[in-house]
A protein has these predicted regions:
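Conserved ABC transporter NBD signature motif
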Residues: 25-36, 41-45
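Catalytic Walker B motif of ABC-type/P-loop ATPase nucleotide-binding domains
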Residues: 130-134
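H-loop/switch region of ABC-family ATPase nucleotide-binding domains
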Residues: 165-166
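A short, surface-exposed alpha-helical micro-motif characterized by mixed small hydrophobic
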Residues: 171-173
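Helical segment within the ABC ATPase nucleotide-binding domain
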Residues: 145-157
């Protein structure tokens, strides 16, 4: 999704994850109409989201953050070995090499490393769709590149990735298809190879671009 700031693109995320109600239209997933009554139902389908605030706990380590709310237990006791093994397997599968130890406290991580942990948590549960809400906001150049490389690896691993961003450079670096929103409504969805940055700007600011056939 590409949009101007403040056009309620995060609200679209809320609808996609059923955190917000759907008042009209249909929810189609894998070609079928589905009725979802909340975020847990969306999660059960394999839809995961990384919100802009990341929802990480600074006082917990990487492993406990990745399993927060969905801890593995054995005889009502946390199964630390299983969680650590799964966390390491997930990070290795994404070729994450930027954290020294998965037992590091999140408070010691950089912005890019925090984003990496949040994204890794989203793919830990056999997810099919990962929604990233402005994952590079407030990151430096090197950290942004780190996160975008991770987004590419998600796609290479067969996951559908919905990237919500106001940064055209980021969008054009990783996207296959671009959906432009104007005043909270879909202006157009076009293959990246068939549209230029200036045309995207026209779509998100005016809702139309004659050069791509949207009037």
């Amino acid at each position: 999704f590409q949009a101007e700031d403040g056009i309620r693109d995060t609200s679209v995320t809320g609808v996609q994850t059923c955190a917000l109600p759907i008042y009209s239209g249909e929810f189609i997933f894998e070609g079928k109409k589905v009725e979802l009554d909340g975020p847990r139902a969306a999660t059960s389908l394999g839809i995961e989201v990384v919100y802009q605030d990341l929802a990480l706990c600074d006082n917990l380590d990487i492993v406990h953050n990745m399993f927060l709310g969905r801890e593995k237990k054995r005889n009502n006791v946390l199964n630390e070995h299983e969680m650590e093994s799964l966390a390491r397997k997930t990070l290795d599968g994404l070729s994450v090499r930027t954290v020294k130890s998965i037992r590091q406290k999140v408070s010691s991580l950089s912005g890019g490393q925090r984003q990496t942990v949040a994204i890794a948590r989203s793919v830990l549960w056999n997810s099919k769709v990962v929604i990233l809400d402005e994952p590079t906001a407030a990151l430096g150049v090197a950290q942004t590149e780190q996160v975008l490389n991770l987004v590419k690896r998600l796609a290479e691993n067969g996951l559908a990735v919905i990237l919500i961003s106001h940064n055209l450079n980021d969008v054009f670096e990783v996207a296959d298809s671009i959906a432009a929103l104007h005043l909270g409504r879909m202006a157009a969805q076009i293959d990246k190879s068939k549209i230029a940055p200036q045309q995207v700007i026209e779509l998100i600011t005016t809702g139309k671009s004659e050069s791509v056939g949207v009037k």
